[in-house]
C-alpha cells in the first residue's frame, strides 16, 4: 500500500525487515511485523532487536507526523523498552501515540501486541526535533 511504500522510502530498514504500515495519522501510527525465523533468537522467539526496530520506526513516524513548522526531521535521543511477553509466531503490531509534542522534543509511547492482542512490549522514546542549518 501507499503508506507502507512511504515508510520504506523514509526508513529503508523497515523494508529490509518487512514492516508494513496500517495507519498513519498525527494521533496514531500502526506498523506491523510478521514473525520470521530469520528475525528470531535460537529458540524461535522474535528477537528483541527486531521488536525494538519496529517500535523505533513507529515512534519515529509518529514524531515525523507531528513535526512543528520549520522542522526538517527527528532523531531518537532516548528509548526505554519493557518486554512483557515472548512472540513465537504471527504478526506483531506496534501502535505509537504522541504523549508530548514540543518545539525541541517529541515524546512517543508505543505498545507492541501479539496476534491475539496481548501486550508484549511497551516503549517510551524521546525524539529530538531537527531544524535546517542556516
What are these model-predicted stretches?
Residues 1-134:
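Terminal targeting signals and extreme-terminal segments of soluble enzymes
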Amino acid at each position: 500500500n501507499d503508506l507502507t511504500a512511504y515508510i520504506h522510502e523514509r526508513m529503508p530498514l523497515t523494508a529490509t525487515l518487512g514492516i508494513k504500515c496500517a495507519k498513519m495519522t498525527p494521533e496514531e501510527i500502526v506498523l506491523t511485523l510478521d514473525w520470521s525465523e530469520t528475525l528470531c533468537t535460537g529458540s524461535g522467539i522474535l528477537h528483541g532487536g527486531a521488536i525494538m526496530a519496529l517500535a523505533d520506526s513507529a515512534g519515529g513516524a509518529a514524531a515525523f507526523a507531528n513535526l512543528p513548522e520549520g522542522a526538517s526531521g527527528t532523531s531518537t535521543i532516548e528509548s526505554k523498552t519493557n518486554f512483557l511477553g515472548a512472540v513465537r509466531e504471527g504478526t506483531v503490531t506496534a501502535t505509537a501515540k504522541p504523549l508530548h509534542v514540543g518545539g525541541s522534543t517529541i515524546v512517543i509511547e508505543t505498545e507492541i501486541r501479539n496476534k491475539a492482542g496481548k501486550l508484549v512490549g511497551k516503549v517510551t522514546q524521546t525524539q529530538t526535533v531537527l531544524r535546517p542549518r542556516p
